């Protein structure tokens, strides 16, 4: 295999194992054995297990955040709160709900494991993007203070991660046969409306 192929194979294998077992419960030896590479390869390409996790998450977050900002920059000056929230949520659902994307599961596992290093890495990646969105929402809802917007943004992100991780399993269990609950476009629209109402309420 070429260097590029070897590196990608390690990333793909780590993604699968982190999603299945969690970061803490996955050893480098498990990753290298499943990827059929030697143990030194992880250090060579990534510098260790933690940096491997960061690159795996960063490879998804960076294009996602770039698309969010592209859509935000395309808004007209009279944009609504819903327009801003749509720019934030739609790309996440489009990218992270793909069948082969285990990132929501990995993030959920890391949250349960209280992985502070990953949380700080994500914060560094997201902070500049979040600042843009907070400013854009504040423009449409000037009566809200920064603390109020941040708290509601926390609830929005929590709702997004729940939807991505559970795939509406609870709603589908309550009402079997509701096919629209399997439609990502429908789910995205409902989440956008739900979060818009949450931000807009006095």
What name fits each language-model region?
Residues 1-3:
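N-terminal intrinsically disordered/low-complexity leader segments
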Residues 6-15, 31, 56-68:
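Generic hydrophobic, amphipathic alpha-helix propensity
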Residues 9, 17-51, 55:
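Helix-turn-helix
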Residues 11, 65, 82-89, 153, ...:
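Short, amphipathic alpha-helical "lid/cap" segments that border enzyme active or binding sites
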Residues 42, 54-82:
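Small/polar-rich, solvent-exposed N-terminal microdomains that initiate assembly or binding
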Residues 69-102, 153:
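Hydrophobic alpha-helical connector segments
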Residues 83, 97-124, 168-172:
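Amphipathic alpha-helical segments used for helix-helix packing
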Residues 94, 98, 124-154, 159-202:
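C-terminal peripheral helix-coil segments that are non-catalytic and often amphipathic
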């Amino acid at each position: 295999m070429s260097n590029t192929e070897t590196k990608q194979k390690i990333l793909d294998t780590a993604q699968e194992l982190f999603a299945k077992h969690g970061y803490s419960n996955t050893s480098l030896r498990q990753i290298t054995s499943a990827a059929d590479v030697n143990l030194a390869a992880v250090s060579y390409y990534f510098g260790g297990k933690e940096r491997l996790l960061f690159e795996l998450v960063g490879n998804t977050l960076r294009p996602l955040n770039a698309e969010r900002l592209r859509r935000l920059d395309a808004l007209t000056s009279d944009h609504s709160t819903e327009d801003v929230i749509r720019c934030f949520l739609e790309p996440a659902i489009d990218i992270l709900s793909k069948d082969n994307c285990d990132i929501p599961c990995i993030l959920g596992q890391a949250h349960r494991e209280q992985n502070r290093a990953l949380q700080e890495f994500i914060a560094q990646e997201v902070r500049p993007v979040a600042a843009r969105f907070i400013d854009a929402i504040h423009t449409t809802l000037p009566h809200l203070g920064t603390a109020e917007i941040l708290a509601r943004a926390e609830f929005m992100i929590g709702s997004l991660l729940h939807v991505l991780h559970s795939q509406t399993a609870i709603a589908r269990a309550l009402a079997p046969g509701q096919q629209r609950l399997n439609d990502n476009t429908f789910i995205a629209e409902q989440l956008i409306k739900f979060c818009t109402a949450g931000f807009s309420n006095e």
